[in-house]
Curated annotation (Swiss-Prot):
GO terms for molecular function: calmodulin binding; DNA-binding transcription activator activity, RNA polymerase II-specific; RNA polymerase II cis-regulatory region sequence-specific DNA binding. This is Sex-determining region Y protein. Transcriptional regulator that controls a genetic switch in male development. It is necessary and sufficient for initiating male sex determination by directing the development of supporting cell precursors (pre-Sertoli cells) as Sertoli rather than granulosa cells. Involved in different aspects of gene regulation including promoter activation or repression. Binds to the DNA consensus sequence 5'-[AT]AACAA[AT]-3'. SRY HMG box recognizes DNA by partial intercalation in the minor groove and promotes DNA bending. Also involved in pre-mRNA splicing. It is found in: Nucleus speckle; Cytoplasm; Nucleus. GO terms for biological process: cell differentiation; sex differentiation. PROSITE patterns: HMG_BOX_2.
Amino acid sequence: MVWSRDQRRKVALENPHMQNSEISKRLGYQWKMLTESEKWPFFEEAQRLQAA
C-alpha cells in the first residue's frame, strides 16, 4: 500500500523502539481516520503502479 509504506518509515523513525505489530495497529487506525478524499490520491497512485 502506497500510503502505509511511507507512513511506516515515518512512524518507525519517530518511535525506534516500537514493535512492528504496534506500528501496524497505529497505521491501521490512522488510515481509518482519513476521509475518502484524503485516501483517493493513494488509491490512484496504487492503480497507476499496477498498470505500469
